[in-house]
């Protein structure tokens, strides 16, 4: 009888031990799951330093970025990119009663990295927007563009509060690393090249150049810059090997499929020089100009335009 009782007790002890071990594993597993669920997630936006070429008396800038697209702001004195590390905010983190999103944590940052076009090697400098802002509940939008005014480069930034959709627009003076309200810039939002585009549009020449650049080279021409079409397929088709540009600037031509932008710096910009230069660059190797035509809207007559001055003369003889 005692031997039977000992066996029963032994079995019970074993069962209790197994049960305890199972419960311990479940608690441990649950704890890990909770930690994983509560672990803070972050959204990062970082654009590596692009390839930069400054050429032709430092008037023109060629910027290439490996793997194509990315946030870059193209200026007179700086090429700027974002370096951002921000919390991913979910509903549980928002205090609706206090009408706001969580405060900016110490490990969050919203920085603008700017590469100096006027210094050898294009060294970088960091503008820490959160430090300049002093506000601890606004987060920045993941977007970058450039506004040029008063001979300075500015980066507009949209700030927002997650909890109540409140937003604020500021503008960052990259040269002096200061913040100003966007309201102080009356000309903001107006196209810098609208007048140049109108000049080139006489006789539909502007659209003629755009069409030629797209069909021949899969590049997008505008009154102020050249970049690539958005689709990856178009990038793969880019081939400028038989152009004057490739002959004159072989190092840049090698990076053409990674082109982010080719532009004339704002302070040095003139419609005449941009127009004439592009016609020469993208002419077939050995030829003077890309073949483009002005069209008389009344008669349909086409006239080849070989320079900005020729376009002006044609326009004077064909008033609309």
Where are the language model's segments positioned?
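Repeated scaffold domains used in trafficking and secretory/extracellular systems
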Residues: 65-72, 135-147, 187-199
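Short glycine/acidic-enriched loop and turn motifs that connect beta-strands
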Residues: 85-90, 95-97, 160-165
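Residue position within the beta-strands of beta-propeller blades
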Residues: 81-83, 157
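N-terminal Sec-pathway targeting helices
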Residues: 1-13, 24
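Structural signature of eukaryotic scaffold interfaces centered on beta-propeller domains
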Residues: 53-55, 60-75, 144-151, 317
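Surface-exposed loop/turn elements that mediate protein-protein interactions on large endomembrane-trafficking
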Residues: 35-64, 97-136, 167-194, 207-272, ...
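Sec-dependent signal peptide cleavage junction
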Residues: 21-36
């Amino acid at each position: 009888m005692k031997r039977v009782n000992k066996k029963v007790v032994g079995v019970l002890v074993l069962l209790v031990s197994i049960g305890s071990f199972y419960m311990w594993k479940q608690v441990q597993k649950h704890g890990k799951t909770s930690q994983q669920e509560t672990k803070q997630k972050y959204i990062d936006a970082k654009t590596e330093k692009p390839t930069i070429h400054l050429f032709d008396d430092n008037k023109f800038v060629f910027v290439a970025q490996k793997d194509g697209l990315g946030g870059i702001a193209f200026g007179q004195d700086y090429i700027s990119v974002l370096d951002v590390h921000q919390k991913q905010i979910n509903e549980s983190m928002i205090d609706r009663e206090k009408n706001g999103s969580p405060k900016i944590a110490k490990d969050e940052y919203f920085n603008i990295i700017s590469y100096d076009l006027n210094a050898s090697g294009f060294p970088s400098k960091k503008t820490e927007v959160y430090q300049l802002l002093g506000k601890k509940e606004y987060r920045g939008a993941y977007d970058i563009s450039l506004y040029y005014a008063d001979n300075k480069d500015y980066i507009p930034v949209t700030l927002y509060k997650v909890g109540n959709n409140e937003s604020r627009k500021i503008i960052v003076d990259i040269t002096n690393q200061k913040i100003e309200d966007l309201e102080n810039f009356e000309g903001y939002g107006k196209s810098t090249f609208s007048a140049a585009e109108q000049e080139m549009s006489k006789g539909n020449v502007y659209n003629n150049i755009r069409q030629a650049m797209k069909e021949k080279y899969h590049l997008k021409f505008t009154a102020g810059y050249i970049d690539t079409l958005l689709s990856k397929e178009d990038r793969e088709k880019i081939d400028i090997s038989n152009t004057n540009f490739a002959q004159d600037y072989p190092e840049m031509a090698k990076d053409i499929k990674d082109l982010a932008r080719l532009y004339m710096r704002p302070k040095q910009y003139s419609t005449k020089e941009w127009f004439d230069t592009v016609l020469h660059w993208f002419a077939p190797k050995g030829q003077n100009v890309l073949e483009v035509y002005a069209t008389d809207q009344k008669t349909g007559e086409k006239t080849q335009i070989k320079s900005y001055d020729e376009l002006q003369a044609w326009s004077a003889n064909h008033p609309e």
